[in-house]
Amino acid sequence: MALFRGMWSVLKALGRTGVEMCAGCGGRIPSSISLVCIPKCFSSMGSYPKKPMSSYLRFSTEQLPKFKAKHPDAKLSELVRKIAALWRELPEAEKKVYEADFKAEWKAYKEAVSKYKEQLTPSQLMGMEKEARQRRLKKKALVKRRELILLGKPKRPRSAYNIYVSESFQEAKDDSAQGKLKLVNEAWKNLSPEEKQAYIQLAKDDRIRYDNEMKSWEEQMAEVGRSDLIRRSVKRSGDISEH
């Protein structure tokens, strides 16, 4: 199970390594930063039908133990790349077998979902739909965050308090993280104005660093046609050329 969970994480990190179809809808993944569409079933509603794996993921789970046995010292990321390469070279006739299995299971899944929903009360159905919306928003935010990391967006500036916490947290004498944070917070309150001023200055310096890095980064985004990532205030001021 741990190996399987590791494989999921590597697949998400690698992006489109041969995964052409979304496990949820069977369609191609349109993201500009290719991330594997990982299926998740509803959990809090009880026995909600579980989505079937896509043809590629089914193939991967079959091949992973074989590759692991052949290459026991290889990293999981290397094994996943080998499996992806094997999938790309797989004859279309063999791929169609996996795709046919997926389509059959997807049809059965949709029928099971319909039957499941018929048993729900209006309030339960509303709760399930609310949960689905929240999960979609969470996933959208996660994909956006990963995209910005891949594009090298500068880290936001830290406050004086955050700088102090990062410096003092490990030295705090408490076994729990919550206890450490409480001690650091109390120590911050007891700092003299002069002592706090040093951290305030560091925060100002970090803000200057952030502003300079963001200006450069947004210019790069404008050059590559990603003006959607430029802050609105910058667009209005005309500091960034979108051409």
From Swiss-Prot:
Q: What happens when the gene is disrupted?
A: Embryonic lethal, due to absence of mitochondrial DNA. Mutant embryos die before 10.5 dpc.
Annotated GO CC locations: mitochondrial nucleoid; mitochondrion; nucleus; protein-containing complex
Instruction: Please give the residue positions where the record annotates the modification N6-succinyllysine.
Output: K66
The PTM Phosphoserine maps to S54, S55, S60, S159, S192
Q: Where is this site: Intercalates between bases and promotes DNA bending?
A: L57, L181
SUPFAM superfamilies named among the record's database cross-references: HMG-box (SSF47095)
| GO molecular-function term, one example from the UniProt record | mitochondrial promoter sequence-specific DNA binding
Query: What's the PTM story here?
Result: Phosphorylation by PKA within the HMG box 1 impairs DNA binding and promotes degradation by the AAA+ Lon protease.
Give the GO biological process terms: mitochondrial respiratory chain complex assembly; mitochondrial transcription; positive regulation of DNA-templated transcription; response to hypoxia; response to nutrient; transcription initiation at mitochondrial promoter
Name the chain's protein. Answer: Transcription factor A, mitochondrial
Origin species: Mus musculus
What is the primary gene name for this protein? Tfam
